[in-house]
Amino acid sequence: MLGRCGGSSILGGKMLIPLKIEGYAHQRFLRGCIMRDRVVIKWGGGLITDKSSLCTPNLEVLNQLASTVAECHAAGQEVILVHGAGSYGHLRAKNWRLNEGHIPGMLQPEGSICSSQRDAVEQVRREMLELNQHVCDVLNEVGISSIVHPPHQWATNTGMNFRGDLGRFNHPNGRKIHITFGDIVEVEGEQRFGILSGDDLVVRLALELPRVKRLVFAIGGVDGLLRVPPEFATEDDLIEIWSPDIEFEGVHQSDIDVTGGIGLKAARGAHVAAHEIEVLMVNGGKPERVLAAMLGNPVRGTIVTNKQ
């Protein structure tokens, strides 16, 4: 971290010289090249879309979140962005049971524009690219260009152990940020296809890319993990530090959501935290909190740990 060390060190035979430059407090220099610390941020699908209405973005929230990325980038951190699907994926995937993989002879759900599961797979992929374009557009408006990595083009299988080369996220990006998202990918064997959740993507990105300092989940409607259901919660019910042995309450819209909801986020966050990476959950509707979490500043939310 810049400003914390006045010496230098040798890593792999190369000189690493910490320097302090005004406005860039989170970067190092490797043989003259800026090596920024990284933060992986997950924008929840329910946060950036209207989950009750098919393919409807929440542009107000998207614009607010885009500003946090620009400010974090200006502060000297490199951002890796992963976003969820919300109403662009879950509703159609639920109707066609795409999370279960190939179902021989499945009948067309009433009112569906798709004629088969495979047709639905391709439609959801197109819709995810449409949502991603909204994300790229709001980022472009604040001066941030994007390098997009649709998982169906480079990843196979589902869960944390999916297969795919994450080196594509490691290329120098200047004023650009790398983006990926939850998607439907090909799966080996009889299943044929399945849903690769953004919550699984962030685990691998946080653990396998160098210089990642923290993982932030920007979630919708709540300040973090709660001791009671959200509709009954007061400010005192926020779990400020959570580990897997602590029970919590959360809303999982199983009638819509085909991934694991906030429970999956907590479990995946604990897995990352076990590797000494900071993990936080914050209210994504409060952009000042999202920015503070990305920068590692004190913020209202839940710190996820793996300590029992």
Task: Cite the ranges covered by each PLM segment.
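C-terminal accessory domains and tails appended to enzymatic cores
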Residues: 302-303
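Nucleotide/pyrophosphate-binding catalytic subdomain
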Residues: 23-24, 29-278, 284-292, 298, ...
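N-terminal amphipathic/basic-hydrophobic helices that include classical n-h-c signal peptides
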Residues: 1-34
